[in-house]
Amino acid sequence: MSIKSDRWIRRAAEAGMIEPFEPGQVRTAGGNRIVSYGTSSYGYDVRCADEFKIFTNINSTIVDPKQFDEKSFVDFKGDVCIIPPNSFALARTVEYFRIPRSVLTICLGKSTYARCGIIVNVTPLEPEWEGHVTLEFSNTTPLPAKIYAGEGCAQMLFLESDEVCETSYRDRGGKYQGQRGVTLPRT
């Protein structure tokens, strides 16, 4: 497997792999500095959309991935999401992805957030998976933390295999195939 360059990412985006797509790095908006997004040397920095689900313990439920209670979250829509101390929020990417059959995509958090104690977690985007990426933000600090919608939040790295997989995510009918919006756990 080899990591793919900015040139490859641009060609794949022309074929519909990332929509909407930014061919370069965007670092300012309206004359203000922002957390960068767009194509980098060997990756693509995604943006966070303005839809969030913030963890709450108002209902004092137990978190169970097999029987997840939607009441564990408070829905929020806005330009800035404030995650409570030592808490968690879900969001989604602005970008919609269509991963080629020979590609596995790994997501890493951006250092701007990591250096503030905000960790972004996303599982790999498997071959032939498509959808909005659900982003998991953990605020590891004892203070409230801000996440900015419309700005960069994580980087996607594209790894292409020299051999196409036997069974893709689409072939096996993956439960998150075609997801739109912030998607909660499914079993």
UniProtKB/Swiss-Prot annotation:
<feature type="binding site">
    <location>
        <begin position="134"/>
        <end position="136"/>
    </location>
    <ligand>
        <name>dCTP</name>
    </ligand>
</feature>
<comment type="similarity">
    <text>Belongs to the dCTP deaminase family.</text>
</comment>
<keyword id="KW-0547">Nucleotide-binding</keyword>
<dbReference type="InterPro" id="IPR011962">
    <property type="entry name" value="dCTP_deaminase"/>
</dbReference>
<feature type="binding site">
    <location>
        <begin position="110"/>
        <end position="115"/>
    </location>
    <ligand>
        <name>dCTP</name>
    </ligand>
</feature>
<feature type="binding site">
    <location>
        <position position="155"/>
    </location>
    <ligand>
        <name>dCTP</name>
    </ligand>
</feature>
<dbReference type="GO" id="GO:0006226">
    <property type="term" value="P:dUMP biosynthetic process"/>
</dbReference>
<protein>
    <recommendedName>
        <fullName>dCTP deaminase</fullName>
        <ecNumber>3.5.4.13</ecNumber>
    </recommendedName>
</protein>
<dbReference type="Pfam" id="PF22769">
    <property type="entry name" value="DCD"/>
</dbReference>
<dbReference type="InterPro" id="IPR036157">
    <property type="entry name" value="dUTPase-like_sf"/>
</dbReference>
<dbReference type="InterPro" id="IPR033704">
    <property type="entry name" value="dUTPase_trimeric"/>
</dbReference>
<keyword id="KW-0546">Nucleotide metabolism</keyword>
<dbReference type="GO" id="GO:0015949">
    <property type="term" value="P:nucleobase-containing small molecule interconversion"/>
</dbReference>
<dbReference type="GO" id="GO:0008829">
    <property type="term" value="F:dCTP deaminase activity"/>
</dbReference>
<dbReference type="GO" id="GO:0006229">
    <property type="term" value="P:dUTP biosynthetic process"/>
</dbReference>
<comment type="subunit">
    <text>Homotrimer.</text>
</comment>
<dbReference type="GO" id="GO:0000166">
    <property type="term" value="F:nucleotide binding"/>
</dbReference>
<feature type="binding site">
    <location>
        <position position="169"/>
    </location>
    <ligand>
        <name>dCTP</name>
    </ligand>
</feature>
<comment type="pathway">
    <text>Pyrimidine metabolism; dUMP biosynthesis; dUMP from dCTP (dUTP route): step 1/2.</text>
</comment>
<feature type="active site" description="Proton donor/acceptor">
    <location>
        <position position="136"/>
    </location>
</feature>
<comment type="function">
    <text>Catalyzes the deamination of dCTP to dUTP.</text>
</comment>
<feature type="binding site">
    <location>
        <position position="179"/>
    </location>
    <ligand>
        <name>dCTP</name>
    </ligand>
</feature>
<keyword id="KW-0378">Hydrolase</keyword>
